[in-house]
Amino acid sequence: MFALKFILITSFIASTALAHFTLDFPESRGFVSDIEGQFCGGFSTVGPRQPFPLGSGPVHINSHHSLATVVAFISTSSNPTSFDDFNTTSNGTIIPLASNIFQVTQGEKCFNIDLESLNVGLTNGSEVTLQIQYDGGDGDLYQCSDLVLIQGYEVPSNETCTDDASRTSNASSTSSGSATATSAAATSSSSGTSGAIKEVVGLGALSLALGIAGLIIL
């Protein structure tokens, strides 16, 4: 009986450890579960840039956890190599978060981001890298996608997002990037004290706090 319980507990822990997420649209640089906890999910080289709306555009993920916390942020560097590259533009302008910090349940989820509204000088043809940070309770995971922003670009009809998870989950922070909204839940390798702070670490603690607060989630 003890052996059976041990096997069941071990199996549960193993299955939990294997739970991850995928970035399905825009397409991720790549996915290897064992290295998803690294910067850009372990894929540090810029890939082919995909067209993406300069204005509002959809992001689709597949969550493998029963509950997880998600946030999106961007870099305007042509070759981002660290989280610092997602903090400021080349002229020192602080880059706000690209999404709210929000929660999702297991399954396919989507949310919309409006990169033009970040007011960091993005225009038609701007090249950015989108990074998604995801925490299902067993550590932060990451996925990156390299984009070229197109004014008026229409995504395929099957990729639109009408059930926006970042809005229906009563997100804890807005994309305005204010330090007040993010500092309680985030730290950074950067010493800046204003604007968005990335990487947003400690999402697990934030998930717990949001759960206790009784947020409405998808």
From Swiss-Prot:
Manner of cofactor binding, per the entry note: Binds 1 copper ion per subunit.
Lipidation (GPI-anchor amidated serine): S190
Domain of life: Eukaryota
Keyword tags: Cell membrane, Copper, Disulfide bond, Glycoprotein, GPI-anchor, Lipoprotein, Membrane, Metal-binding, Signal
Renumbered residue ranges of the record's region Disordered: 160-194
Subcellular location: Cell membrane
Gene Ontology cellular-component annotations: plasma membrane; side of membrane
Record: residues binding Cu(2+): H20, H65, D138
Residues modified by glycosylation: N87, N91, N124, N158, N170
GO molecular function: metal ion binding
Cysteines paired by S-S bonds: C40-C144, C110-C161
Membrane topology (UniProt): Lipid-anchor; GPI-anchor
Cofactor: Cu(2+)
Biased composition (Low complexity): 167-194
Residue ranges the record assigns to the propeptide: 191-218
Residue ranges crossing the lipid bilayer per the database entry: none
PANTHER family named among the record's database cross-references: COPPER ACQUISITION FACTOR BIM1-LIKE DOMAIN-CONTAINING PROTEIN, HYPHAL ANASTAMOSIS-7 PROTEIN
Known role: Lytic polysaccharide monooxygenase-like protein that has diverged to biological functions other than polysaccharide degradation since it does not perform oxidative cleavage of polysaccharides. Cell surface-bound protein that functions in the copper-accumulation pathway shared by the CUF1-dependent copper transporter CTR1. Involved in maintaining cell wall integrity during copper deficiency. Binds Cu(2+) with an estimated 1:1 stoichiometry and might serve as an extracellular copper ligand.
Protein family: Belongs to the X325 family.
Record-given protein name: Copper acquisition factor BIM1
UniProt source species: Cryptococcus neoformans var. neoformans serotype D (strain JEC21 / ATCC MYA-565)
Name of the gene: BIM1
